Amino acid sequence: MANLKELVEFVENKRHTPDVICLLGNHDLSYFNGNGKCRFDYWQQEEVKELISNLNPQLYYVIGDLTPEIPNKYLFSHAGITKNWLDYNNLELKNLDNIDITNISPLDQVPYSRGGYSMYGSCIWNSLEDFQVQVPYKDYYQIFGHTWGGRTNPVIKKNYAMLDCCKPFVLNTETKQIEEWIL
């Protein structure tokens, strides 16, 4: 709870600048729709839900065409977005904006690899291993986490970066490089 309150305070202090975007994750979603309760605090549900709501979490965030010389589009999400999952649910990326997180939805699809019952994991439940064998969504460079697995370094490839390794990173929009953020 202390970490969540610290995060909310940090985000509130950064509201005047557009460089902090909060993404909705699998642990967050369970406080809204009551499904998939892993690491879920029943006795603090309403307070946690309110704090997470204050962060205005997004399911994804897109940055496009940062420089005209080398145009790129970056897609940020909690766990990576695949064409397989979107097609399986007859969704396009923009449809995610209309999902009601207070109800059970395709967001609750947990892949077999994570102990779930779905062939494809959602953008908050997918694993790195599943992402690697599926078709990434369109022509975006994807940046995501959700697959720590004890890693101490990020997994950075030509079409994606999985940054869940207990370190903060920033996307340098001038050099288009992912850099470790040193406080």
Please report, for each region that a protein language model flagged, where it lies by residue.
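Short, conserved active-site loop motifs that form the nucleotide-linked donor/cofactor pocket
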Residues: 20, 59, 74, 160
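Active-site-proximal loop/helix segment associated with metal-binding centers of metalloenzymes
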Residues: 43-50, 65-135
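Core catalytic region of metal-dependent phosphoesterases/phosphodiesterases
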Residues: 1-54, 61
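Short hydrophobic beta-strand that contains or immediately precedes a catalytic carboxylate
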Residues: 24, 76-77, 162
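Histidine-centered divalent metal-coordination motifs
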Residues: 26-27, 78, 143-148
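Conserved beta-sheet core of the metallophosphoesterase superfamily
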Residues: 127-182
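Short, surface-exposed beta-strand/loop micro-motifs that present aromatic residues
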Residues: 58-69, 170
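Short catalytic/ligand-binding loop motif for oxyanion handling, primarily in non-cytosolic enzymes
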Residues: 29-33, 77, 83-87, 150-153, ...
